[in-house]
Every structure is written in structure tokens, then in C-alpha cells.
Amino acid sequence: MIRYLFISVLIFIISCSDKKQPVDISVIRDSINAISTNKKMVKIDSGSYQAFYGKDSGNIVRVKAFYLDETAVTNAEYLKFLKANPQWTRNNVLRLKADENYLKNWKSDFEIPEGVSPDAPVTNVSWFAAVAYAKSVGKRLPTVDEWEFAALADEHTANASLKPEFTAYILNSYQKKYKYKKPVKQNRPNYYGLYDMYGVVWEWTEDFSSVMMTRESRNDKSENEGLYCAAGALTSSDLRNYAAFMRFALRGSIQANYCINNLGFRCAKDID
């Protein structure tokens, strides 16, 4: 637990030292060729949860019903996207939209990494790339609130946040290494039918850069410095906060063009 606290505080310091502007999804103006997908999505019914970040911390947030992919996007699925949209291959992508680590382990533009399952989550992809993929399949990335709300579920209940064993499972899953090389669906699904919300890869969200802002300032796109840094007042007695803090610290410390070895994504969709 001390190691977790150290890692969290380290990321927290990095995130608080970086004045970030929220990323505007409208910057993705490239022409994207659509691809077909038969990936199963599950319905997440509307509800509420206790938010963790900024001035929303401790507040009850309402989440509308939405659809969410049952698994993270896989290497095979992303390869199909690349073949239809070669401007997003490793050798063609703009550095503005993906750093030098983009798909760094792929053997070539159209060959997935050696020793990694085609059905494993694609990683080393930027937020821009994830948004482009989602656009190609007629979807979007989930919001922070949607992801956090869906991730409250264990195998049996929609909200397991008060179960000590669930918190222990989450924290333990964060210690596992190289899970991103294995196929999805290796663990049992949660209450909704979602696989691998923990312990395989971290996942991009549409509004990941909003963690340093209040809900009000997110709405008007204005900057609000230091609000997220108030999370440093977390007490060591609340393990649930540690788990949430690790996720929000990561989101607060990355930029949209970052590509990380264990960071992938899954897609969401509005309910018409």
C-alpha cells in the first residue's frame, strides 16, 4: 500500500505541475473511412455515483444511459482500422497527434507486435488515435463519468464500491504486469457484462483532461488551476479513494498525443 501511495503522489505531483487545457474533440477533422464492426456493446442503465475529482469530489453525479463496448479495442480490430485509414499507421501519423511511442512494438505498419495476441487490447495509441478509431465505427469514447460509473460494478452488483474485497481486487489488479499482451475476456465479466475494466490496461476517456477542472468550468471550457490538486488531502484510511486517485492522477498527468504501453481504450455510444 505504501508503494501505491508513493506512485499516486508522484503522478499527482506531475499532474499538478502541468497547466493543462481540456482537449476539444472538434480538432479531429481528418477524413476517416468507416469500417464495419460486430463488437458487442452492453447497455449501461442510467444512475448516479459519487464523483472523486475537483469540486465535484463527494458530489452525486447523474449519468444517462449509454452503450459501452464489452471489451477494449483489440489489436486485430485496430489493424482493420489502419488498413482502411493508412494515415494513422506508425509511419504516417502526425507527431502532433501521436508521440514517438505510437504503436512502437508493431513489427511494421500492418503487423502487430510479436508475442502479443491479436485479441489483446491495442496499446501505445494516443487519445487522437482512439477518437479517430471510434469515429470510424460510428462511436465515441466514454466520458470519465460514464467509465467510472460502469466500473463500479463487480460480478454481482451494479455498485460494489463499498465492498472491501472489491477495492482489494482493484488495487491488486493494478500490480499485474504485461496483462495487455493477453487476449481480452480472460476474466469474468462484471454485472453489466463488461470485461477487464481493471487489471489489463488503463483506458482513454473522451474528457480525460477535465480532471483538473470543476464541472462548471468544463462546460464553458475555461481553465481552473489547482482544483484537482486538492485531492492531495486524501487520507490514508480510505482505500477506495486510493483506487480512484490512481486513475485520476494518471488522467491528469498525460497529454492527448501520449502513447503508453498499457494504455488502450474502448468505445461508447449514445442511446437514441
At which residue positions do the language-model features occur?
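Sec-dependent signal peptide recognition
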Residues: I2-I7
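Sec-dependent signal peptide cleavage junction
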Residues: K19-N38
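Short, P/G- and charge-enriched loop/turn segments at secondary-structure junctions
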Residues: R29-I32, K55-G58, L250-A256
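Functional-site microenvironments in short loops/helix caps that host divalent-cation chemistry
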Residues: Q50, S108-G252, A256, N261
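Short, structured beta-strand segments at or near domain termini in extracellular proteins/domains
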Residues: I260-D272
